[in-house]
UniProtKB/Swiss-Prot annotation:
This is Ribosomal RNA small subunit methyltransferase G. It is an enzyme of class 2 (transferase). It is found in: Cytoplasm. S-adenosyl-L-methionine binds at residues 85, 90, 154.
Length: 223
């Protein structure tokens, strides 16, 4: 007799974490339903594909979903998003779920085929408006949308590299970048000033801890 696979995290733990996340960022019921579908699919795929660090699964909603969802409040009028290195879908799929009711669209860029397949399935299951591009970020800028409101990335590359990827796609006065960073943000900012002129704005993550969001709206390469 074949036994059902044991859940990666208990239902009660995940429900408690979800409640904590939605207390931080209240959302409409329709968006909650889309995120529920996405989270359920991620748990299924996580058993065979490493989409997020296993140690973070009990905090899936606070550590990943809410951390991603807070970007919407920083760019409430943004409709055209591009997410570098989407991986397990944070923040790309979460943003796409949020865009479903406002006519927005998210382009998700991922270089690993298995993860790109998951992202496509996640968008389908959640009913979220997005396109997945299987590509390496640095070599395929011409394949990405050119009219963008916001460019995002989370746990992908050092800040100075992310700015290098984003710079050709940013329209002054129109496009902003929101990069999620951790405790080393100050060191990354210092390193980035060696290569770029920019005036970053820092936002502390609503999820607490040592997370930061680096907001950038104008960059210029140093010569």
């Amino acid at each position: 007799m074949q036994r059902a696979a044991r859940p990666l995290v208990s239902v009660s733990d995940l429900d408690a974490d979800k409640a904590a996340a939605l207390k931080l960022i209240p959302i409409p019921s329709a968006l909650e339903a889309r995120l529920d579908a996405y989270v359920a699919l991620l748990q299924q795929w996580q058993a065979k594909t490493n989409l997020v660090a296993p140690s973070t699964l009990p905090q899936l909603w606070t550590r990943h979903v809410a951390d991603s969802l807070q970007l919407v409040s920083l760019m409430p009028h943004a409709r055209r998003w591009l997410d570098f290195g989407s991986g397990g879908g944070f923040p790309g799929v979460v943003l796409a779920c949020a865009m479903a009711d406002v006519g927005g669209h998210v382009t998700l860029v991922e270089r690993i085929a298995k993860k790109a397949a998951f992202l496509r399935e996640a968008l389908r299951v959640a009913g979220a408006p997005g396109t997945v591009i299987l590509a390496d970020i640095g070599d395929n800028v011409d394949r990405f949308p050119q009219a963008l409101d916001c460019i995002t990335a989370r746990a992908v590359a050092p800040l100075h590299q992310l700015i290098g990827f984003a710079e050709p796609l940013m329209t002054p006065g129109t496009t902003k970048a929101l990069f999620l960073k951790g405790q080393d943000v100050d060191a990354e900012l210092t390193e980035t000033t060696k290569y770029w002129k920019f005036q970053p704005k820092l936002h502390a993550s609503v999820t607490g801890g040592q997370g930061w969001i680096v907001e950038i709206d104008h960059i210029e390469r140093r010569t």
